[in-house]
Design a protein with these regions (language model features):
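RNA-contacting regions in translation and RNA-metabolism proteins
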Residues: 1-40, 46, 53, 57-75
Length: 75
């Protein structure tokens, strides 16, 4: 899931070298996405639409392997 999130985020931003994902395992897997401050709007989108879409795609991919994944976006 981490690789999928990296791929999606890097394709959206102007500074793909500053994209990082930290994976925290537990009952649920938490993926913390960090991007450059100037790219934050591109990852969140208007009214959070892009962020919602990213979460939906990652959750759908995770559900295929019976996992629960939460995507958090940090700056």
């Amino acid at each position: 899931m981490k690789e999928l999130l990296l791929y999606i985020a890097r394709s959206l931003v102007d500074h793909p070298d500053q994209v990082s994902v930290t994976e925290l395992e537990g009952e649920e897997t938490v993926l913390e996405l960090r991007v450059a401050p100037e790219d934050m709007g591109k990852v969140i989108g208007k009214s959070g639409r892009i962020a919602k879409s990213i979460r939906a795609v990652v959750s759908a991919a995770a559900s295929k392997s019976d996992k629960k994944v939460i995507v958090e976006i940090d700056n």
